[in-house]
Amino acid sequence: MSESELGRKWDRCMADTVVKLGTGFGLGIVFSLTFFKRRMWPLAFGSGVGLGMAYSNCQHDFQAPYLLHGKYVKEQ
């Protein structure tokens, strides 16, 4: 795997982590305010789920060395 491919995978991983963590946190806020009387655990749960999903996606991306954004990279 070349350095540029590795950099692209790290960039995609970090962007995915920010999006999923923010979405989980946002959903935690919504559920905390509407259903759970302003408790803190929905925020932690939503953030944890988002972080776990992002970690799983990153792990999958790094374990598949010949896939990059859904395209096969040919060996040279």
Curated annotation (Swiss-Prot):
Topology, Mitochondrial intermembrane side: 37-76
Keywords, ordered alphabetically: Acetylation, Membrane, Mitochondrion, Mitochondrion inner membrane, Transmembrane, Transmembrane helix
GO CC entries: MICOS complex; mitochondrion
N-acetylserine PTM positions: 2
Membrane-protein topology: Single-pass membrane protein
Predominant location: mitochondrion
InterPro entries linked: Mic10 (IPR007512)
Annotated PANTHER family: MICOS COMPLEX SUBUNIT MIC10
Subunit structure, interactors included: Component of the mitochondrial contact site and cristae organizing system (MICOS) complex, composed of at least MICOS10/MIC10, CHCHD3/MIC19, CHCHD6/MIC25, APOOL/MIC27, IMMT/MIC60, APOO/MIC23/MIC26 and MICOS13/MIC13. This complex was also known under the names MINOS or MitOS complex. The MICOS complex associates with mitochondrial outer membrane proteins SAMM50, MTX1 and MTX2 (together described as components of the mitochondrial outer membrane sorting assembly machinery (SAM) complex) and DNAJC11, mitochondrial inner membrane protein TMEM11 and with HSPA9.
Record-given protein name: MICOS complex subunit Mic10
Upper classification of the organism: Eukaryota, Metazoa, Chordata, Craniata, Vertebrata
